[in-house]
Design a protein with these regions (language model features):
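Surface-exposed binding/hinge segments that line
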Residues: 62, 94-138, 146-150, 155-162, ...
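Detector for C-terminal structural segments
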Residues: 162-166, 267-298, 345-355, 376-491
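Extracellular/periplasmic solute-recognition and catalytic clefts
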Residues: 83, 94, 101-104, 159-170, ...
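A structural "hinge/loop" feature
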Residues: 7-26, 46-48, 73, 121-130, ...
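Structural transition elements
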Residues: 156, 249, 284-324, 342-349
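Gly/Pro-rich hinge or "lid" segments in bacterial periplasmic/extracellular proteins
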Residues: 41, 126-192, 202, 308-313, ...
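Ligand-site clamp/hinge motif
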Residues: 147, 175-226, 355, 363-366, ...
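N-terminal lobe/hinge region of extracytoplasmic solute-binding protein
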Residues: 5-54, 79, 85, 151
Length: 491
């Protein structure tokens, strides 16, 4: 039994085609054509090899033979034709929209004929949202697919899903086609795996310490000293793939005013949050993309950094006057906002630090705490003003996900819709012909978003994995969730 990262909490189903949120179970139920390693390199999986034409307009994949879905159906080129078609017009259509059609020269060759060059296609194909389900089972289940039944070719099968609580998986004993991301190419050693969602970090720590769970993925940094003091607990710290940030609702007053957004952003001290909430583990975030991406290397003048003097000056000039109680007001309206956060410990503590920092600006931020499912419902309804949020994603196209107008109201819960932003988005997403062009275009896109203060970057964490070292044996190279198949139980 293991506890999954809270960024995956509340996943409503295990349908990669129609979901906007999936938990780690989806990586284990489904395989993908290619897999991306922790070092960002790509490895063959259901595609044994692939070639791209010089102009980028055709991609040819040689498919692995002998693969079968959990329902016994064969995997072949016809599967790929059906699979790509299922994304059309759906929530994840952007993953395949550069593909015009799929040709099948033979039973185990699939050729993508492109509408345009799309250097990022290889990344898309490795996404958790591009796990390949069984056509037969998917079509038979209809809209209910992914809740009771989820049929892939992966090392685990879905036994049950209780949304917001746990996902139970059982080993696929017929599995013989593991990728290079795992040492074990066959059936998992752990035969029944429960992925639990425990939002409170203290509870998760106690469960690990007492043997209630065997592994916790995404351990808060402040627990590391306690964990390392336990003789029966091992810890692995891996490069993080996400950013914690503040989200503005740009359509909700007072954050519809760029001056208020800018002042709020400059009033937030990332260094204090790193020290107080994350015990100095990880790094400060000053832009939206993770620092390992080349696209994150923006001109430093666009980075969002703490400057309380300038923040106060901006509001003074904009007519937000301080009252005798220290709270600013303009046109009779006090500067009071709702600060939404999730119940998980790091989210709540971050909100409390931000609340105190905004008080120094003359802004009252009332903290309202939600569970992971309810807060997403609030985002979809546009009922939020300011929120502590987090994403895990290692590609610049996360900017499309959160800031493209087509994704309003969710996942673009910033409600950001701006002509110049859309223009830069389209150039980066649709007109980049080579990888270098794509990097340059995404830098420009992010620099514009930074200049509009549609978010406040806070912290870039590491991924801490703690496990019961007396019960579980892990490889030296451990990259969850792929490496779960390598974990063995000490008898």
């Amino acid at each position: 039994m293991l506890v999954i990262s809270n960024s995956e909490a509340g996943a409503p189903n295990q349908d990669p085609i129609r979901a906007s949120l999936l938990n780690a179970g989806a990586y284990l139920i489904y395989d993908r054509l290619v897999e991306q390693d922790v070092d960002q390199a790509y490895h063959p999986h259901l595609a044994e090899s692939w070639e791209t034409s010089a102009d980028g307009m055709t991609w040819t994949f040689k498919l692995r033979q002998g693969v079968r879905f959990h329902d016994g159906e064969p995997f072949n080129a016809a599967t790929i034709v059906w699979w790509i078609g299922k994304y059309r017009g759906g929530v994840n259509d952007t993953l395949v929209d550069a593909i015009d059609h799929v040709e099948t020269p033979d039973e185990y060759t699939a050729r993508f004929v492109m509408k345009r060059a799309a250097p990022n296609l290889i990344y898309n194909l490795s996404s958790v949202f591009m796990g390949i389900p069984s056509p037969k089972s998917y079509d038979a289940a209809g809209d209910s697919y992914g809740v009771i039944e989820a049929i892939g070719t992966g090392p685990y099968k879905l036994e049950s899903l209780a949304v917001g609580q746990e996902t139970v998986l059982v080993a696929n004993e017929d599995y013989t086609w593991g990728s290079d991301l795992s040492g074990n190419k066959g059936a998992p050693y752990i035969k029944r795996l429960t992925l639990r969602e425990i939002p409170d970090a203290s509870t998760a720590f106690l469960e690990l310490k007492t043997g209630g769970v065997g592994m916790v993925i995404g351990v808060p940094d402040e627990f590391l000293p306690q964990l390392r003091a336990e003789t029966n607990i091992g810890v692995k710290s891996l490069p993080g793939l996400g950013v914690t940030y503040l989200m503005f609702n740009s359509k909700s007053e007072p954050f519809s005013d760029i001056t208020v957004r800018q002042a709020t952003a400059l009033a937030v001290d990332q260094g204090a949050i790193l020290k107080s909430v994350f015990s100095g583990v990880g790094v400060e975030a000053h832009q939206f993309l993770i620092s390992s991406l080349t696209e994150s290397k923006v001109d430093p003048k666009f980075e969002i950094r703490y400057d309380i003097a300038k923040a106060n000056e901006l509001l003074d000039k904009a007519g937000w006057a301080r009252g005798s109680d220290g709270v600013r007001a303009k046109d009779g309206k006090p500067l009071k906002v709702q600060l939404s956060t999730q119940s998980e410990t790091a989210f709540r503590r971050t909100a409390e630090i931000v609340q105190a920092q905004l008080k120094a600006l003359g802004m009252v931020a009332e903290i309202v705490t939600f569970d992971s499912t309810t807060i997403r419902d609030q985002f979809r309804k546009g009922e939020h003003q300011l929120a502590v949020s987090h994403y895990d994603w290692n590609n610049a196209d996360i900017l499309d996900w959160f800031y493209s107008a087509k994704n309003i109201p969710y996942p673009n819960s910033t409600m950001w819709n701006d002509p110049r932003s859309e223009e830069l988005h389209d150039v980066a997403m649709l007109q980049s012909r080579t990888w270098d062009e794509r990097v340059a275009n995404f830098k420009k896109y992010q620099e514009y978003l930074l200049s509009q203060f549609v978010f406040v970057p806070l912290h870039e964490p590491v991924l801490n994995v703690a496990y019961n070292s007396t019960r579980l044996t892990l490889r030296d190279k451990f990259f969850p969730p792929f490496s779960i198949v390598d974990v063995s139980v000490v008898e």
